[in-house]
Each structure stands twice: as structure tokens, then as C-alpha cells.
Amino acid sequence: MNLNFNPLETNLVNLAIVIGVLFWFLRGFLGGILERRRSAILQDLQDAEARLKTASEELTKAQSELAAAQQKAEQIRIDGQKRAAAIRAEGEKRTISVMAAIKQGAAADADAEASRIKDALRREAAMAAIDKVLTDLPGRLDDAAQSRLIDSTIRNLENA
């Protein structure tokens, strides 16, 4: 195999001219396309950075609002617990007060009933004693002594 070193016969000159012309024409065409693509990519990056910044600001704002809402919810829960405790304590105080009033009423009723029973027993004992004396005395006393005893007993009964 022989190598041909004649530049005109091997089309090296033609190839160099065609490549140079293509390079010169395509440089402007491809350079414009690449420049437009570069500008579009830079614009997309700037838009993405702006959206990221906006999203970050909104996230920070939402987090602060969430923290405030959580604090408010905690305060409401604490206030509710305090209110429930106060209501429970008030209910207990009222229950104790009502129970004390019922106990005092029952004690007063028991005291009144005991007093009434004591008075009734005293009267019955007095009446029984008087009846016994009245049955025994006529045989023991004369009419004058019997009359004095009856008057004395009547006065004692009136004072009792």
C-alpha cells in the first residue's frame, strides 16, 4: 500500500477549506444557540432560587405561626385544667356544706325528738306517780292533808 503525499490529490486542502468555512459559519450559529440556552438555564436557576427563598420565608412564617398556635393551645389546656379544678373544688365545697347542713338538721331533729321523748317520759312518770299516790293516799291521809297534797301536785304540774 502506497501513501499519497500530494496535498492536491488527497483533498486535504479542500477539507481544510470546508472545515474552516464550517467552523466560521457554525461558530456564530452554534454560539447563538448555546448563548440562548445558557441564558435560559441562568434564568431558570434565578427563578428556582427566588422560589426557594420565598418558600423558605413562608416556611419560617408557618413555623412561627405553628409555635404561637401550640403555645395558645397549651395555655387553653392549662386554663381548662385550672377551671376544671376550680369547678371540682367548688362542687366539693358545696357538697361538704350541704352535708354539714343535713348533718346539723339531723342532729337538731334528733335533739328535738330526744327532748320531746324526755318530756313525754317525765309527764308519764309524773302521771304514774300521781296516780299511784292518789290511789295510796286516801287510805293514809285524812281529807285536809289530801287536799293540800293535791293542791301542791297541781302547782308542781303547772310549773313543769
From Swiss-Prot:
Record's keyword terms, sorted: ATP synthesis, CF(0), Hydrogen ion transport, Ion transport, Membrane, Thylakoid, Transmembrane, Transmembrane helix, Transport
Cellular localization per UniProt: Cellular thylakoid membrane
GO molecular function, one term: proton-transporting ATP synthase activity, rotational mechanism
Topological type in the membrane: Single-pass membrane protein
GO CC terms of this entry: plasma membrane-derived thylakoid membrane; proton-transporting ATP synthase complex
CDD domains: ATP-synt_Fo_b (cd06503)
InterPro entries noted in UniProt: ATP_synth_b/b'su_bac/chlpt
Pfam family, one: ATP-synt_B
Chief localization: membrane
Subunit structure: F-type ATPases have 2 components, F(1) - the catalytic core - and F(0) - the membrane proton channel. F(1) has five subunits: alpha(3), beta(3), gamma(1), delta(1), epsilon(1). F(0) has four main subunits: a(1), b(1), b'(1) and c(10-14). The alpha and beta chains form an alternating ring which encloses part of the gamma chain. F(1) is attached to F(0) by a central stalk formed by the gamma and epsilon chains, while a peripheral stalk is formed by the delta, b and b' chains.
Family: Belongs to the ATPase B chain family.
Main function: F(1)F(0) ATP synthase produces ATP from ADP in the presence of a proton or sodium gradient. F-type ATPases consist of two structural domains, F(1) containing the extramembraneous catalytic core and F(0) containing the membrane proton channel, linked together by a central stalk and a peripheral stalk. During catalysis, ATP synthesis in the catalytic domain of F(1) is coupled via a rotary mechanism of the central stalk subunits to proton translocation.
Stated name of the protein: ATP synthase subunit b
Organism: Synechococcus sp. (strain CC9902)
